[in-house]
From Swiss-Prot:
Residues 185-227 form the WR1 domain. The lineage of its organism: Eukaryota, Metazoa, Ecdysozoa, Nematoda, Chromadorea. The gene is igdb-1. This is Ig-like and fibronectin type-III domain-containing protein 1. It comes from Caenorhabditis elegans. SUPFAM superfamilies: Fibronectin type III, Immunoglobulin. Residues 23-918 are extracellular.
């Protein structure tokens, strides 16, 4: 089983398939040797039950594998032998370093086997939790920094090597945990300042907050910068003046929007000390050109000569009040989203609605300002940059009151102006035999001094020589040296050997040299190296489909006849007798990736040279979505992907046949091609329509794709109880009801057993929002995706298995909503009800919806009103009870409802026009009622009362049956709430056992009084209760 070099005999195959089948979990990893041979096995028709051997798996083979072991074992061994020569092994020495709360740095070394064949690496990372998705990052380079991780979370990662012919198995999995981050309390207004790695910016006396922020959390372990609460700043100014004994006539000047009058000149220092709040405002004072003797008002000791500096008061006020004006906060999350050799796209997070422009500044590495640009969107693209150069950028938000503090700098380096992997050394050239004694052969080559991008190598080059006995071995032998020659020893006499060499600088390995064949025979020289020339000579090696090319393979002028075979894709040409060259003229097509020229003689010796060709793919452009549904004031992203057809395509978007004017373009080059995204912020009705992604290549060819943006303004449900009420009405019960509930944990994919409710779930999940992205991530098949986007759908398609996933995505879209309202206040008067409520201060777009209907009437429709104010007036019937629900909403969804009630008037109001006689009788009735109430109050003092009177006044005069008043604490929480337990209402005053007391109040039912106490039935309506909402 372990001797892969030879195919097993028929008898051995039977034994392996039966007796030895249980040993495969031990053998498979060994013979796979860190490489994945599955692709080859599939091409050779190996059955599914035996593919575990090809992938080096440790899984046991099932009973059904007996057949494929008998039929496919030889094919499996052939693929494994082939993979030894063409597949790299897994990356080695994978290590984790430089952990933060949101990032990790990964390093690795080249594979132990076939490192020269590696073209790129792929990183796989996921949270170490059940059901978490795997993030795939292609073309990573060691060391690699992976960003966007969650703090205080455990992750697992592996790496995979890729060559042109296959891949390795994943490397040994690495487990690590990101660092925790302390989330500070929420600021009164806005959010604290965060660093680029997600940590909060710490402030103290040495590191003060920028203008517009104050250092809070004093006395705790964490002090951070929060935006100034402008509603309290002047109050603090005034209180400071009072404490400093400011004269009453000057107190009106202790406001940030006031200056100090001349009559208060002698109190200038008191005004300065309170207005400055002890902060250093020197930078602002210098900008305002405050005279040097008067600058001590802007910094310690905050005292100035009043006569000399009183004229500077207006400048002081400008600086002191700047921190309390509604200036923009610092721009957050500045990122360099795409980088090329001469351009870079900068994006950031726009959190405020009143920004009029962003100032974007570009700096050189030394800090010199190069460019200053203005952007009305939260993205900007710098062009005409220098290749392979370090830059930094920062962004400042500006509104009508002024500019906020600058963001943190984001640094980046433009790409070199060379071809892919230009930092690798070039392949060694002119590999040849220096001398040959038979068992020992000296081979030499020209030294490598430059990289593929023409830069000079700066570190020592290590050469690796590979040689293989073509007849008796399948394993390459390697030798390493820092010289440009090496002696291969102990060769088998008269044997043929393949030999090639690679160069390595640090961890970057070149492509292989040409391959020569050596005959281990005394004084047997090698063959000359062929030279391949391709016309036209594209420096980047990229050719267009259908382009006419000429490939020439030639030898130096020698007198010996040699055979020359030139192979390009499916084309093979040979030289004429005695000719030292061969030419192939053809058109470039997709089958061409390498030009191979082999020179051979009659002794079996060869010298093989190769040259790689890169072919452009046929131009195509596709839209990510054919239809995009958006809501009023929502942002939309129209994405198209362009593949092939030109090195520098021009990509633009059109709307209804004209160039799109509202929005901005974000372009990014990826391994798959170009990804273009057209962003439109705060969509309006006029933005709806058909959008085209138009791509024009350098040769003038044009391709395009279309997508429709569908606009909708209705975001509120007809029924305020939303999805949950629909599910309850449809009879969905048990755990399946959790999928309908906003804020609850949805069912995991493994536990879905709700197919009996599938039709009902899909009905209630119907929504105008587009949930396609969520559904795709949840594994919903393409045939069922129309249910996620509100499109037309064929009832003949069965989507019951995806019902819970579709419902979960529908619910998630509603969770991205404003927070709920609080402190609802109701004031009723003469048939009108005024309702007010509180809502957190925010600059985000929102409005409120108020639902109301008569209580205790489930058949009456809800009435719905919308407002942008935090109050509303309703016309209601004063003789009816009403239930009211209020929610906050925006384009992303709406909050949970806050319920309340409007009680009816205790007595209908009478008209005031009935005259004085009506007033007289009202007074008489009130006097009679007063006398009656007073009499009942006197009677109630007596311990024993006749039954009718006692029942009438509701007395419970049994001292052993105490009473209690309670209200339902879950009122207004229709989806849940705490239970309430009422203890101590039952039993007598005598001492009972603990068990008896426990069982007495734990009963879940309302329990009537003892049947033996009929004479006092009115006194003891219930003994105790446990209520569950």
């Amino acid at each position: 089983m372990c001797n892969v070099a030879e195919d097993p005999s028929s008898f051995s195959t039977i034994t392996i398939a039966t007796t030895c089948r249980a040993e495969w979990p031990k053998v498979s990893p060994c013979i796979a040797d860190g490489r994945n041979h599955t692709d080859c096995c599939l091409k050779k028709g190996v059955q599914h039950d035996c593919l575990e051997i090809c992938s080096g798996s440790t899984k046991e083979l099932g009973v059904h594998s007996v057949l494929c072991l008998n039929l496919d074992l030889q094919a499996i061994y052939q693929c494994i032998r082939q993979g030894y020569e063409t597949h790299p092994s897994a990356p080695g020495n994978v290590t984790i370093s430089e952990l933060t709360a949101h990032s990790v740095t990964v390093q690795w070394t080249e594979p132990n086997s076939n490192a020269h064949l590696v073209e790129n690496y792929t990183l796989f990372i996921r949270k170490n939790e059940h059901g978490e998705a795997v993030r795939t990052v292609k073309n990573v380079i060691s060391p690699h920094v992976e960003l966007g991780l969650d703090p205080d979370s455990e992750y697992v990662l592996t790496l995979q090597s890729h060559s042109a012919n296959g891949t390795s198995l994943p490397s040994t999995a690495k487990l690590f945990s990101t660092l925790p981050t302390t989330r500070p309390p929420l600021c009164t207004i806005g959010e604290p300042i965060y660093m680029n790695d997600g940590r909060v910016m710490i402030c103290d006396a040495v590191n003060p907050c920028p203008n517009g922020f104050r250092c809070t959390g004093a006395g705790s372990d964490l002090s951070y910068c929060c935006p100034h609460d402008g509603t309290h700043s002047s109050e603090e100014f005034t209180s400071c003046c009072k404490e400093q004994k400011m004269p009453e006539s000057c107190m009106s000047s202790c406001q940030y929007n006031m200056t100090l009058p001349e009559s208060c000149k002698e109190n200038l220092n008191t005004w300065v000390q309170c207005a400055s709040e002890g902060h250093d405002h020197l930078r602002c004072c210098l900008q305002e050109e405050v005279s040097k003797p008067c600058q001590t008002a802007c910094m310690h000791p905050f005292t100035v000569p009043a006569d000399e500096c009183f004229s500077e008061v207006s400048k002081y006020r400008t600086c002191f009040s700047a921190a309390h004006q509604a200036l923009p906060a610092a721009v957050r999350n500045v990122e360099v989203s795409s980088i090329s050799k001469d351009s870079a796209t900068i994006s950031w997070e726009d959190l405020e609605a009143n920004i009029i422009v962003f100032r974007v500044q570009l700096f050189e590495k030394g800090g010199n300002l190069i460019k200053t640009e203005n952007s009305s969107a939260d993205i900007f693209r710098f062009i005409d940059l220098e290749p392979n150069k370090d830059y930094s950028v920062r962004v400042t938000a500006i509104n009508f009151l002024g500019e906020g503090p600058p963001s943190w700098n984001a640094t980046f380096t433009t790409k070199p102006a060379q071809i892919y992997e230009g930092d690798r050394p070039v392949a060694p050239e002119k590999l040849r035999i220096s001398w040959n004694s038979g068992p020992r052969v000296n081979v030499t080559w020209d030294p490598v001094s430059v990289r593929r991008n023409a830069e000079v190598v700066t570190k020592p080059i290590e050469y690796t020589i590979y040689y293989l006995d073509t007849e008796q071995s399948s394993t390459w032998t390697t030798l390493r040296t820092n010289q440009t020659w090496v002696v291969m020893r102990d060769l088998r006499k008269d044997a043929l050997y393949y030999v090639y060499v690679t160069a390595k600088e640090d961890n970057r390995t070149s492509r292989s040299s040409s391959i020569i064949t050596i005959l281990a025979q005394k004084d047997s020289p090698g063959l000359p190296e062929p030279t391949i020339v391709i016309e036209p000579d594209h420096k980047d090696g990229v050719f267009s489909p259908g382009e006419k090319i000429s490939i020439n393979c030639s030898l130096p002028n020698i007198k010996k006849h040699l055979n020359i075979d030139l192979t390009v894709g499916s084309h093979v040409v040979q030289n004429d007798h005695g000719a030292l060259w061969v030419i192939l003229e053809t058109e470039a097509d997709e089958a061409m990736d390498t030009a191979t020229c082999a020179v051979s003689d009659t002794d079996g010796r060869q010298h093989v040279a190769m040259k790689h060709l890169v072919l452009e793919r046929k131009a195509s452009v596709t839209m990510k979505k054919d239809k995009i549904r958006v809501l009023d004031d929502q942002s939309v992203e129209i994405e198209c992907i362009y593949r092939g057809g030109g090195l520098d395509p021009k990509i633009s978007f059109e709307k209804d046949g004209k160039k799109a004017s509202r929005g901005f373009l974000n372009l990014k080059k990826t391994e798959a091609g170009y990804v273009a995204k057209w962003h439109i912020r705060k969509v309006k009705q006029e933005d709806a329509g058909f959008y085209k992604c138009v791509v024009t290549s350098s040769d003038g060819s044009r391709v395009e794709a279309s997508s429709e943006v569908i606009f909708s303004t209705e975001t509120l449900p007809v029924n305020p109880k939303l999805i949950l009420q629909c599910c309850e009405d449809e009879g969905i019960t048990g755990d399946c009801l959790q999928a309908c509930n906003i804020g609850r944990t949805s069912l995991s994919i493994k536990n879905q057993n709700c197919t009996r409710f599938a039709v009902s779930l899909l009905k209630c999940a119907s929504d105008i929002r587009d949930h396609s992205d969520c559904c795709i991530a949840s594994g919903v098949t393409s045939k069922c995706l129309p249910l996620c986007s509100g499109d037309s759908f064929s009832p003949d398609i069965d989507c019951s298995e995806h019902a819970v996933s579709i419902m979960t995505c529908s619910v998630k879209s509603h969770e991205h909503a404003p927070s709920e309202v609080s402190n609802v206040r109701i004031k009723a008067s003469e048939g009108k009800v005024n309702i007010e409520w509180d809502y957190p201060l925010t600059k985000d777009y929102k409005y409120f919806a108020v639902y109301y209907r008569k209580a205790h009437d489930d058949h009456e429709d809800w009435h719905k009103l919308k407002t942008i104010q935090q109050n509303i007036e309703l016309d209601v019937d004063p003789s009816e009870d009403y239930e009211v629900g209020i929610l906050a909403a925006n384009a992303l969804g709406h909050s949970r409802l806050m319920y309340s009630a409007i009680p009816k008037d205790s007595e209908p109001r009478r008209s005031a026009s009935k005259g004085s006689s009506s007033a007289f009788w009202i007074v008489v009735i009130l006097v009679v009622f007063g006398v009656l109430i007073a009499g009942l109050a006197v009677l109630s003092k007596r311990r024993e009362l006749p039954y009718p009177i006692g029942k009438f006044i509701g007395r419970r005069n049994d001292p052993n049956q105490p009473t209690v008043a309670f209200e339902n604490p879950a009122y207004g929480e229709p989806w849940g709430g705490a239970e309430v337990e009422i203890r101590g209402l039952g039993g007598s005053a005598t001492t009972g056992t603990a068990a008896a007391t426990q069982s007495e109040w734990q009963s879940a039912n309302l329990e009537a009084n003892s049947t033996t106490d009929n004479s006092h039935e009115y006194r003891n309506g219930m003994r105790y209760a446990k209520l569950e909402t």
